[in-house]
Amino acid sequence: MIKKILIANRGEIACRVIRTARRMGIRTVAVFSDADREALHVREADEAVHIGPAPSSQSYIAIDRILDAIRTTGADAVHPGYGFLSENAAFAAALDAAGVIFIGPPVGAIKAMGDKITSKKIAAEAGVSTVPGHMDLIADADEAARISGEIGYPVMIKASAGGGGKGMRIAWNDAEAREGFQSSKNEAKASFGDDRIFIEKFVTQPRHIEIQVLGDRHGTVLHLGERECSIQRRNQKVIEEAPSPFLDPETRRAMGEQAVALAKAVNYHSAGTVEFIVDGARNFYFLEMNTRLQVEHPVTELVTGLDLVEQMIRVAAGEALSFAQDDVTLDGWAVESRLYAEDPYRNFLPSIGRLTRYRPPAEGPTGGGCVLRNDTGVTEGGEISMYYDPMVAKLCAWGPDRLAAIDTMLHALDDFEVEGIGHNLPFLSAVMQHERFRSGNITTAFIAEEFPDGFQGVEPDADAHRVLAAVAVLVHQVLQERAAHISGIVGHHRRVVAKDWVVRFDDTEIEATIEALGEETCIRFGDGGMLTTAGVFVPGATHARFVIGGEPVGVKIDLTGSAIRLRWRGMDVKAYVRSPRVAALARWMLRKLPPDTSKLLLCPMPGVITAIMVSAGETVEAGQPLATVEAMKMENILRAERRSVVKRVAVEPGTSLAVDEVVLEFE
């Protein structure tokens, strides 16, 4: 059996591998860059080796440095995780040459499936359904436009060595094909060191459904069911689930059989994933094969009861699979939400900074027979760096059925506290309660269709306003009673805490009276409605759980001056709790207007300016590219919002900018 595993990765996947290895009695070695000296995976491993500067090109994907770490520690096996070197055939070959076990598939399979053009040809020969397209390399932008026109728009422009949403663009016309070709080429070169591009037909309104395969070195290959990965943004998965709410048993069987056939065609062993796009008639087409463990593997583990990392280790050690295809059953439903360091209110742009607060919900069994799991690689006080992928954690919920899993996830998101960075928790909550998502009627266009103007938060309806008003009154009442008991203010004076309040949210006012009702508290509203409440706010707490109207409510609470900031279910409001008299006077107060930035192009994310496309005095049209910013390994194009004249260019290529720093100024 393997005795020591070096994990050629970082963050949550490194911690994930360490957890299984520890349970199996196998020692682990972490590697780390300058940016990760204090990282969780470094502390969790039995040993840790420094491998270089923060940029991944000089550390996590520097094969010679990984090999040096292997020699230094005497590791007899390497788990590559996902990303970085996980699908690098040269790395796997170097390990073979060094006599080190690669916990993954054979080199030949990595080569065959790692090239998107070759993989599609092999898939077609293996009888796997494929999408029409141009499988030869594209020379330049003009050829990209010509071929796209021949295939028929829309088309998907993709990096041959791509993955993770990088190096991919959808084009609907010749202009977008030319621009998309160059952007895909640049991203592919930066992310994978390989800028080869191909083009295929884009299937409109598709679902993204993938099949998990697992094979051993003795010729057995099985499939472990599917994962629904259609909730995507910019081709990057955000929410996954297993099984899919769309597949019927016949389609599931057919997809599984084709995935196994493809794996056998390349003599595959270890865990791998065959991705398909599926149209509304359940026709499915091969997309790509990922020759590694997927980010979203936990949902498969939760519904099958298997530990995929353990299976990978056992297969790498030469063991045969201990179960057959008929032994694989899907029990219940699992949902995964990816917590990203990104600002949903700024079009999901990357965010960096220190985690001043990181309190995930408790893992394990919950009420109603459900289960929570949180895979993470960070701790409170840790830093989210601009050098790596912005994923902070993967929160997973299992339930006996789909809605039970979704509701468990929704409550867990309510309880998840993250401060110090921008993050997508509010957006995840919004999706979980969206009726279209809950019904299972989803495609890869879900986010674009349901949030066409980006995410601006969830607007409270009348019922939500009542719940938030009740929370605000409960919090305010505790603070008032606490203040009333402070000694030494005025001698022989008994302060009476009022019971009648007016709660203001922006332009909405709600009259509320708080009353004791046995062991519960009753909030009566001015319109005659009422809510019973249970639960206590502890002064200084940033989160509180109540039962309001019979339903559990977990709210994040911040006291900011005279306001109580409440965040719940994607809503973010400031509540002002005042006496009726003060509320009447407050209506006459003037409101401060935000500064005018309409004549500035501000950097929407921390990153590096890679190109400036205009100069001072130039007239630009709406939608015209002005500059590009590279952040988190992604290239982002900044465009003109309207017709304008450039007054001043404030930066030059190579400049590192923080959020909201000026890029251009307009007349």
Segments predicted by a language model, with ranges:
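N-terminal beta-alpha lobe that positions the nucleotide/phosphoryl donor
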Residues: 1-274, 278-297
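Structured functional modules or segments
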Residues: 593-667
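Catalytic cores of soluble metabolic enzymes centered on carboxylation/carboxyl-transfer
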Residues: 259, 298-531, 622-625, 659-661, ...
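Conserved bacterial/organellar gene-expression machines centered on ribosome-associated P-loop NTPases
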Residues: 398-404, 409-419, 590-604, 608, ...
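Short amphipathic alpha-helical segments
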Residues: 166, 243, 389-395, 597-599
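Conserved nucleotide-binding/hydrolysis modules and their immediate coupling elements
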Residues: 516-522, 526-554, 562
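Catalytic P-loop NTP-binding/switch module of NTPases
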Residues: 552, 558-604
